């Protein structure tokens, strides 16, 4: 890392290898969860995805009129340090965060996800990508409208995640944080 937080060539190479290997395994079609007709809507709290890098704690919002036959925008939100996963006592603390709630209150229906990760480094960035892919594969998501937003430590995590997989995200809102990801893959893939 340089003093400005730009990754070394080694970090860029790792991100490129991950992007290439991930893009080979990511399906191109929208798939839904098998029980979509019985799916709970509104805010769904305290979920755990057993991921390749360990458990991913998250909460999400499905529009009240969620329809498996309609493709929805997906917003991946990443809170700052005070809303990260520190054990059961912190479970669901990101639901109180306005960076999650504001997206659920927009007039347009969208799926909103807020992860509670354990750090803001490479592992959490890979978990953020894995969680994004999980929602794309298991919910009715418009793959051309996958967005991300990160604040503070969550901004550091999402800047790395978006740099790892710029093909996954259409746009990224980076707030109150240093940029830890690389710029080139983002510019090359037209991420707004």
Which sequence ranges carry the predicted segments?
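A domain-start/cap signature at the N-terminus of enzymes
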Residues: 4-72, 149, 153-156, 160-161, ...
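Extracellular/periplasmic catalytic domains that process cell-envelope and extracellular macromolecules
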Residues: 51-53, 67-71, 104-108, 140-141, ...
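Gly/Ser-rich "nucleophile elbow"/oxyanion-hole loop immediately N-terminal to the catalytic nucleophile
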Residues: 65-66, 70, 120-152
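Alpha/beta-hydrolase fold active-site loops
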Residues: 73, 110, 145, 170, ...
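Active-site machinery of serine-nucleophile hydrolases
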Residues: 74, 78-129
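Cell-envelope and extracellular/periplasmic
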Residues: 77-85, 136-141, 151-165, 176-177, ...
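Extracytoplasmic/secreted cell-surface and envelope-processing proteins
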Residues: 85-86, 121-124, 156-159, 179-185
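The feature captures the conserved acid-bearing segment of alpha/beta-hydrolase catalytic domains
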Residues: 170-192
């Amino acid at each position: 890392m340089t003093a400005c937080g730009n990754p070394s060539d080694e970090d860029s190479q790792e991100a490129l290898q991950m992007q290439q290997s991930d893009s080979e395994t990511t399906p191109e079609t929208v798939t839904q969860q098998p029980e979509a007709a019985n799916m709970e809507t509104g805010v769904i709290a305290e979920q755990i995805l057993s991921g390749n890098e360990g458990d991913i704690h998250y909460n999400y919002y499905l529009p009240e009129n969620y329809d498996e036959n309609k493709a929805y925008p997906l917003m991946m939100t990443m809170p700052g340090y005070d809303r990260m996963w520190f054990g059961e006592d912190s479970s669901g603390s990101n639901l109180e965060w306005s960076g999650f709630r504001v997206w659920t209150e927009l007039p347009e229906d969208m799926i909103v996800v807020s992860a509670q990760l354990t750090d803001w480094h490479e592992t959490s960035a890979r978990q953020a990508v894995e969680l994004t892919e999980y929602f794309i594969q298991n919910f009715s998501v418009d793959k051309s409208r996958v967005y991300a937003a990160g604040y503070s430590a969550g901004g550091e995590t999402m800047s790395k995640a978006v740099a790892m997989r710029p093909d996954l995200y259409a746009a990224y809102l980076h707030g109150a944080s240093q940029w830890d990801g690389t710029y080139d893959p983002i510019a090359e893939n037209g991420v707004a």
